[in-house]
UniProtKB/Swiss-Prot annotation:
Keyword Transferase: yes
Entry protein name: DNA-directed RNA polymerase 133 kDa polypeptide
Pfam families cross-referenced by the UniProt entry: RNA_pol_Rpb2_3, RNA_pol_Rpb2_5, RNA_pol_Rpb2_6, RNA_pol_Rpb2_7, rpo132
Gene Ontology molecular function: any one: metal ion binding
Cellular component per GO, a single term: DNA-directed RNA polymerase complex
Principal location: virion
Species per Swiss-Prot/TrEMBL record: Vaccinia virus (strain Tian Tan) (VACV)
Family: Belongs to the RNA polymerase beta chain family.
Cited function: Part of the DNA-dependent RNA polymerase which catalyzes the transcription of viral DNA into RNA using the four ribonucleoside triphosphates as substrates. Responsible for the transcription of early, intermediate and late genes. DNA-dependent RNA polymerase associates with the early transcription factor (ETF), itself composed of D6 and A7, thereby allowing the early genes transcription. Late transcription, and probably also intermediate transcription, require newly synthesized RNA polymerase.
Keywords: DNA-directed RNA polymerase, Metal-binding, Nucleotidyltransferase, Transcription, Transferase, Virion
Xref: InterPro entries: DNA-dir_RNA_pol_su2, DNA-dir_RNAP_su2_dom, DNA-dir_RNAP_su2_hyb_sf, RNA_pol_132_poxvirus, RNA_pol_bsu_CS, RNA_pol_Rpb2_3, RNA_pol_Rpb2_5, RNA_pol_Rpb2_7
Subcellular compartments: Virion
Length: 1164
């Protein structure tokens, strides 16, 4: 292909981010942020959370205290690898142990005396078992010396049944921007949350609400349930900041539109009226009176001074160690936003914007659960001490309370899909696609209750804040998850930071801010507030904001702060704020830097020559001003040019308006969308459908398929795609394969391949084309006495079992075969019976339609015998199986044709698959034709000019014209065969061939599009869905067929099916289907007097209603279905009388018989 030029530099820089970067510790880019998140938790954060020393109870004015101390936290990795865990059928867990000491502190004149109450040195191997994240190459964060398995990308947990678990990331409920809401006309609220920094444990949360009603401006209050007083926010700001009301008026009015200034004046005047209405008003006295009233209202046990200190000291926990004056100025900045948002709501980030949210990654899940369960654990110890003191008069703790921290249950629930009593966080990962291991951990979803309160989800729209950071194609197109789960783009990741790094970074930023002249960072009246994680630290001179932000960004890129993912956002538009974000959970991605109208990539001419030998971290160190990591908030409030090409077409003045420039369009797709080809050449819906189908494609075998007793579908003879994108290659999806190359022909074939029908060649199937193997888990639990029952049983279902009661290895199971022995015996109460033992055969049987070979058998002996069997089955394509291309051209096998029935070219080659040609025009999938053309061109010239095999790069989204690809194909054919005529060259480029009719051996009149393409087999298999049943299990209550194919259920024959048969006059068939079955047959006696169903008492049928009236009605026997009787009984139980009545008329088909005179005729 052509040599890289300067215009492709942006693309090459984007590729550098995708490839591994060992110098920065990045070995697998797609899931690196998840590995770091979990590693931070288990190596650092877990120790911080569990290391505790705090009072449990206090007595006698804090002179006596019961203390708890948790120390010696140790985390031990497992001794075995994930493969051994699968073989043993065990989970892959790390063990956490700690020591608990509970003692009593008494303050005396001599000092503090300590008396030991209880202690526990946790050495139990089951104290805390933490599911261990398996990283790339089977590595884990505790033992990095584990061997590398290149095709194992990791990102999963293994639970106790050796089943892989993988989960999505959840959007955190707490927003970083206050939430504005219109309660009713002229009534508004502004609610925000304050969370303590990560170094403050336990984490403190406070939620505040500012309310404003235009008709009652005096009631512009801030409140928080049980944690703060309800007070006018203007007066609170004055109390905290110690400034005048005129100062607050000028601060709120500065750089505001006239309508907002008018409202500000009205609010300040209303606050003045409050002060004037109180004689000798004093702001301290006013606040103290409110605190005292709240103290009485809550009936607090604390003294008034302690209560006031707790309330005001814990006000705004995220500014815990900040002076009250800065808290007051922070409240004024919030009020500015609130008043501006009332008039210009559309300019303020709404609650659905990703700007306002952080993302919970794997490490954050475990951190949150560990924090919550530790508080429960300490609370249980406190309650146990109080109960023992109350009942026995001693301070003691039961050992059971000390040894059950409760974390194991929480972590187990997390892997079962429950995170803090909500669902949607984790799910079992089916092993049919490698892409699921990448796409699910890179997905971002919402809490279920977030969906209910959100305006966005009423229409499920793609929020503008998700642009560039999320893939616009890989979203569910139907079902309940539409718009709720989004896929990160290939350049996007989620930030992680250690507590120590957080504190160091915060300190460095504060030192940098304070290096400015004191007066320039003290413009609290008319300046731009500077916040670090929403905590106000300074207020900058408005004339210096541009220089400050530019210098900060340059220092950040040069590594001055030691963190390249710091976000700095200049919020203008009258809200006037500089926001610096350093916390975890932010979405970040790289952008090209524009400085003073110049693209910095162009200002480094030596970069191009050195780029091939550099990693992404090298570029950041040696050319720091070329690329900047930008979080989603900074991106939203920056001017970003769409592409380098557009930027270079602008004038110099226009260029100066931009801060950043984006990479090419292919980097806006996610990893699943990157597996497609030429999205931009097709119609829009094909991209969404293509992503859904690509995730359903069956991929190659995992490294230890025989050791995992788990369900899975695997491609037996996978092939690496020839036409790929860089993201597909670097993520190892291409190397792990998810399809095969087949030869297709676009044509109609005898009218068989209509719509989505495809024709597939029989010999192609026999040679292993798109052949798969199905691994299936069968698990049963059997009572121990039933399993050990040695009674002889003549059931044919036991023919595949060995003497130990388990199915034989390598046995071929058919439908109805037992998996393990399960014989239940009963003893008859008959002394005269010779053999009073009766055995019942109740095994769980194999129910699949196809035979399977037993690969592994695993048994666990507890109170029950748990038998787990892994079966394997090779499954070739059959009628009804589904296939697709990477352009969403899904097809279903309509006919399996012999080679002799198919058309052939001049070389005798027949197509493997025939696809309906009209599908290209109706679905507008031009890129499918381009893929065939490029794959065929590769076959003509598979090596580059250096003699190296090279795939063809055809990104999912690209700005390359189709003519460029045609020119590439032309060069390949000219190089391999320079003597081709123009017509022959054109036919080869466009893959047009003359095919011959197999019946007449004459050529078709028109040329046929004929060439190779990468074809995918989907997990939708006919034998997994087909249901065939004549007789079988029925439910006990209504005696109708079970529901569900797995339980041997039948297809429902309902009212519509009945009506169809009625239309054809098939009365006997209806009777047979609906009633004539020995299980469903029911004789019922009906009272002709009242219509009740008769009851059977001591063998005699009696109408209860009539017998109480001393009536002797006629009982008529009717033939009905059992479910009808159940329905009538249930209706009667609900107080509804259904009367069965009989028609009083002669038979329809007979007339009364003529009278016959039996007198002898001779007597007449």
């Amino acid at each position: 292909m052509k040599k890289n030029t300067d215009s492709e530099m942006d693309q090459r820089l984007g590729y550098k981010f995708l490839v591994p970067d060992p110098k920065a510790g990045v070995f697998y880019r797609p899931l690196h942020f998840q590995y770091v998140s979990y590693s931070n938790f288990i190596l650092h954060r877990l120790h911080e959370i569990l290391t505790v020393k705090r009072p449990l109870l206090s007595f006698k004015n804090n002179t006596e205290r019961i203390m708890i101390e948790i120390s010696n936290v140790k985390v031990t990795p497992p001794d075995y690898s994930p493969i051994i865990a699968s073989i043993k059928g065990k989970s892959y867990d790390a063990l956490a142990t700690f020591t608990v000491n509970i003692f009593k502190e008494v303050m005396t004149k001599e000092g503090i005396s300590i008396t030991k109450i209880s202690s526990y040195e946790g050495k139990d191997s089951h104290l805390i078992k933490i599911p261990l994240l398996i990283g790339y190459g089977n590595k884990n964060p505790l033992d990095t010396a584990k061997y590398l398995v290149p095709n194992v990308i990791g990102g999963v947990f293994i639970n106790k049944q050796s089943v892989e678990k993988v989960g999505i990331n959840l959007v955190e409920k707490i927003t970083t921007w206050p939430k504005f809401r219109v309660v009713k006309p002229n009534s508004f609220t502004f609610s925000f949350s304050s969370v303590s920094p990560p170094n403050v444990l336990p984490t403190r949360y406070r939620h505040y609400k500012i309310s404003l009603d235009i008709s009652q401006l005096e009631a512009l209050n801030i409140s928080s349930t049980k944690t703060f007083i309800t007070v006018n926010i203007v007066l609170l700001s004055q109390y905290l900041s110690r400034v005048s009301l005129e100062f607050i008026r000028r601060s709120l009015s500065y750089d505001m539109p006239p309508e907002v200034v008018y409202l500000v004046n009205a609010i300040i005047d209303s606050a003045k009226r409050i002060t004037e209405s109180i004689t000798d008003f004093n702001i301290d006295t006013y606040i103290n009176d409110l605190v005292e009233a709240e103290h009485i209202k809550q009936k607090s046990q604390l003294t008034i001074n302690e209560f006031k200190y707790e309330m005001l000291h814990n006000f705004l926990p995220h500014m815990n160690y900040t002076p009250d004056q800065l808290k007051g100025f922070y409240m004024i900045s919030l009020l500015r936003k609130f008043l501006y948002c009332i008039y210009h709501t559309s300019r303020y980030p709404d609650r659905d914007s990703m700007v306002c949210h952080r993302i919970l990654t794997y490490g954050k899940y475990f951190e949150t659960l560990a924090h919550d369960e530790l508080e429960n654990y300490i609370g249980n110890i406190r309650n146990d001490i109080m109960n023992n003191h109350k009942n026995r008069g001693t301070y003691a703790v039961n050992i059971h309370v000390l040894t059950t921290p409760g974390l194991n249950h929480a972590f187990s629930s997390l892997l079962s899909g429950k995170f803090k009593k909500s669902d949607g966080s984790y799910r079992t990962h089916p092993h049919y696609s490698w892409m699921q291991n990448i796409s699910i951990p890179r997905s971002v979803g919402f809490y279920p209750d977030q969906v209910k309160i959100s305006k966005m989800f009423s229409v499920r729209k793609y929020h503008p804040s998700q642009y560039l950071y999320f893939c616009s194609s890989d979203v569910p197109e139907r079902g309940p998850q539409v718009g709720l789960v989004s896929q990160l783009s290939v350049l996007s990741s989620i930030t992680n930071i250690l507590t120590s790094e957080y504190l160091d970074l915060e300190k460095k930023i504060c030192e940098y801010i304070r290096s400015y002249y004191k007066d320039d960072i003290s413009y609290f009246e008319t300046g731009f507030p500077i916040t670090i994680e929403n905590a106000l630290v300074a207020s900058l001179n408005p004339n210096m904001i541009c220089d400050f932000v530019t210098d900060f960004r340059r220092r950040k890129r040069m590594g001055f702060f030691g963190n390249l993912e710091v976000g700095i956002t200049l919020v203008r538009d009258h809200m006037n704020e500089i926001r610096i974000n350093i916390g975890a959970g932010r979405l970040v991605r790289p952008f090209l830097v524009v400085d003073n109208g110049e693209l910095m990539m162009d200002a480094c001419p030596e970069l191009e020559s050195r780029l091939d030998d550099m990693t992404f971290s090298d570029i950041q160190k040696e050319f720091p001003h070329v690329i900047e990591m930008v979080d989603i908030e900074q991106f939203t409030f920056s001017n970003v040019c769409e592409s380098v090409q557009k930027f270079r077409m602008m004038s110099k003045d226009e260029r100066k308006q931009y801060d950043l420039c984006d990479f090419p369009a292919e980097f806006r797709d996610g990893y699943v969308a990157s597996s497609l080809v030429g999205i931009n050449h097709n119609s829009g819906p094909r991209a969404i459908l293509g992503c859904a189908q690509a995730k359903q494609a069956i991929s190659c075998l995992s490294s230890d398929i025989r050791n995992k007793i788990d369900n899975g579908i695997h491609l037996m003879y996978p092939e690496r795609p020839i036409v790929i994108s860089k993201a597909l290659e670097t993520s190892k999806i291409a190397a792990n394969c998810f399809g095969q190359h087949v030869t297709i022909a676009l044509m109609s074939y005898k009218g068989i391949n209509q719509e989505d029908g495809i024709i597939i060649k029989k010999q192609f199937i026999q040679r292993g084309g798109l052949d798969i193997v199905t691994a299936k888990k069968h698990q049963v639990e059997i009572p121990l006495e039933n399993f050990n029952n040695k009674e002889r049983d003549r059931s044919n279902a036991y023919s595949k079992l060995e003497s130990n009661g388990l199915v034989r290895l390598n046995a071929f199971l058919e439908s109805g075969d037992a998996i393990a022995r399960n014989i239940s015996s009963r003893t008859l109460e008959d002394d005269f019976a010779r053999d009073n033992q009766i055995s019942f055969d109740v095994p769980e049987k194999y129910t699949d339609m196809y035979k399977s070979r037993v690969e592994r058998v695993q048994v666990e002996l507890t109170d029950k015998v748990k038998v787990r069997v892994l079966t394997m089955k090779e499954r070739r394509p059959i009628l009804g199986d589904k296939f697709t291309t990477r352009t969403s051209q899904k097809g279903t096998v309509a006919y399996v044709a012999d080679e002799t029935e198919l058309p052939y070219d001049e070389n005798g080659i027949t197509p493997d698959v025939i696809i309906n040609s009209t599908s290209i025009f109706s679905r507008k999938t031009i890129s499918m034709l381009i893929e065939v053309i490029l794959t065929a061109a590769y076959s003509a010239k598979p090596y580059n000019n250096k003699g190296e095999n090279r795939p063809v790069c055809f990104p999912s989204s690209n700005e390359t014209s189709i003519d460029t690809y045609m020119q590439f194909a032309k060069q390949c054919y000219e190089h391999s065969n320079p003597k081709l005529s123009d017509e022959e060259l054109s036919d080869k480029i466009f893959c047009e061939k003359i095919l011959y009719d197999p019946e007449t051996d004459k050529p078709y009149a028109s040329k046929v599009f004929f060439g190779p393409i990468y074809y995918l087999r989907l997990r939708h298999l006919t034998q997994d869905k087909a249901t065939v049943r004549c007789r079988g299990k029925k439910t006990k209550l209504i005696r109708q067929a079970n529901e569900g194919r797995k339980r041997g259920g039948g297809i429902k024959f309902g009212e519509m099916e009945r009506d169809c048969l009625i239309a054809h006059g098939a009365a006997n068939t209806i009777t047979e289907v609906l009633k004539d079955s020995e299980e469903d047959y029911q004789d019922v006696y009906v009272c002709e007097n009242c219509g009740d169903i008769a009851a059977q008492i001591k063998g005699i049928n009696t109408c209860l209603r009539c017998s109480k009236l001393n009536l002797s009605p006629l009982l008529t026997k009717i033939d009905t279905t059992h479910v009808s009787k159940v329905f009538l009984t249930q209706m009667n139980a609900r107080g509804v009388k259904v009367k069965l009545d009989f028609e009083r008329r002669p038979p329809s088909f007979y007339k009364p018989l003529d009278k016959v005179d039996l007198k002898p005729s001779f007597l007449v």
